[in-house]
Amino acid sequence: MRGEIISVGTELLLGQIVNTNAKYLSERLALLGIDIYFHTNVGDNEERLKQCLKIAYERSELIITTGGLGPTVDDITKETIASFLNLPLVESEEAKQEIINFFERIGQKPTENNFKQALFPAGSKILPNKNGTAPGFILEKEGKIFVVLPGPPSELIPMFEEHVYPYLKRFTSETIKSRVLKIFGLGESKVEEMVRPLLQGSNPTVAPLVGDGYVTLRITAKGKEEEVYEMISQVEKKIREILGEYIYAVDDEEMEEIVIKLLQKRGFTLATAESCTGGLLAKKITDVPGASKVFNLGVVTYSNEAKEKVLGVKKSTLDAHGAVSPETAKEMAENVRVLAKSDLGLSTTGIAGPSGGSPEKPVGLVYVGFATPEKTYVKKLMLSGNRDRIRTRSMLHAFDMVRRYLEGRQID
């Protein structure tokens, strides 16, 4: 089944509200095997909404609208759909009573315009709204299905789950599933080049996407529930054979979660000493439940004096090489490891910008130190972007060094 979503509301076009409804609906409809080919945002304007409905009617079997079901004059979705389909609006006594009951529960009286929400195009299946005053409805006409939902997510989601999802499930026996592989250490163009033959497939499909400092490959398959996972697994296996060590996580997993799991599995502990990342490493680690079992200490030593007094970085090192140097990164990692009595020590020092750079040490220069029981590694990074981007990428590189070590892989 081909479907599309029309989101109604001038506030969406002005950027005052983020359209989370379209994301939620697309994800849920994919589980039903319904292909959503188009998302449209349109303001509270009858003529423009009619144009959108006309286009959708010609190309889609399922048309879902969100928003525009309120009691005010600019809430015109129902009226516009009724006019577009040449259907009269009919009052529902049941919906009207529900509106009265809703206001009684909150100790108020409905105004006359509230009862506008009890009007529906003739032939509609009315969807009760337990969380507001705007019922939705489903309408089938000439082989097309219209699903009309309120805009607030707190009303839309329960209505969809309780009424719309079971209703649409009757029309399909397929599902659409996806798996996302997260890749670090390779750029998008390189990833695409390495897996290019797999990008040509139609089912499953493989699509590269750029994240904040990493690349993802989304594998999507459509078919019977029992078939799609096998289809995805076969393609994933081929991708892992090509990219192997660069794949660090699947779906919603984050780099820090993987690091914590590996530390727990190996029985290792970690301590961090940060300068340019300003506590970002420690923050990300402690966001993960159970981190206290493997994370001993996190310190932010921003000044040279703090590096010297707290971490014991030698004054001669700072004088000779400066705070942003491989020598300082090395001592920071080694010394925090000893200070915390941890198995591993991780450090960052660099210039995140926008100021502070020089021709010899430009903005984006970062050194990551990683001390292990066997040896200490120092990685030089030349990063681009704004301050947050440089800090985030420094964090990912640091955690990736830990991941590689714990997985027994080569540390670049």
From Swiss-Prot:
Organism superkingdom: Bacteria
SUPFAM superfamilies per UniProt: CinA-like (SSF142433), Molybdenum cofactor biosynthesis proteins (SSF53218)
Pfam family, one: CinA
InterPro entries recorded: CinA, CinA-like_C, CinA_C, CinA_KH, Competence-induced_CinA, MoaB/Mog-like_dom_sf, MoaB/Mog_dom
Coiled coil stretches, renumbered: none
Disulphide bond pairs: none
Residue ranges of the TM segments: none
SMART domains the record matches: MoCF_biosynth
Family: Belongs to the CinA family.
NCBIfam families, A to Z: cinA_nterm, molyb_syn, PncC_domain, PRK00549.1
Full protein name: Putative competence-damage inducible protein
The species this protein was found in: Caldanaerobacter subterraneus subsp. tengcongensis (strain DSM 15242 / JCM 11007 / NBRC 100824 / MB4) (Thermoanaerobacter tengcongensis)
